[in-house]
Amino acid sequence: LLWVCSFCKMKLQTGKKTGGRMMQNLEQFLRLLTGHFDNREQFNQMQKAEKVYPLAEHVNTVCNDKIRDLPADFRGKFLVEESYYETNGKKHASAHLFLFTEEQDGVLLTSYEIPEGEDKNSFTYASMKPVDYGDLKKSEKFTPALYREKDGVWEGGSTSQFTPVMKFRLWERFSEACLEVSESIEVNGRRTFGYDDPIRYKRV
């Protein structure tokens, strides 16, 4: 019995250490991802090369403080991603709500619908109203993306089948240097949105 108790205690301590390491991974990942970023340096290079490319801006903010009744043992982090693009003088904004959770082999991104009652066209962290955790809905179209870390660099992505003929591809790499984001949409196998080079966001 003494041996069993000692073994259980050892397993419990090991579990705590593993959980701690996992949370450290999530914190490291979010430290790279959260903040205010733009690709102005890359945009200027593309302008000099006379290539059509967007001037893009990302504002990423953890928003657990705006979500009520999170489970007591909840360890994930919800994040509002605000994106702003300008191409040939035309401006476009979009926003997403993501949940990041620590998994055994990396960090998982799960997309959620913008909360009911919010304006999808102007949704931001600042405008987000408090919402109950139970009212949040996962996106049925988006395939969760898994990110793995190697030498301080996180890389991952996913492919989502939005409709029988429309496919969305996401690939991202996050490091201290920049956030690299590649998004494309294919319809019937033909790319209708996206660029050859990933957008390189640097912290503002």
Predicted regions and their residues:
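Short, Lys/Arg-enriched N-terminal segments with co-localized hydrophobic residues
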Residues: 1-22
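Alpha-helical structural elements
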Residues: 2-3, 32, 149, 166
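Short N-terminal helix-initiation segments at or just after the protein's N-terminus
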Residues: 22-25, 144-146
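N-terminal helix-cap/turn-to-beta initiation motif at the start of protein domains
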Residues: 23-36
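Soluble ligand-binding/transfer domains with enclosed cavities or grooves
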Residues: 38-204
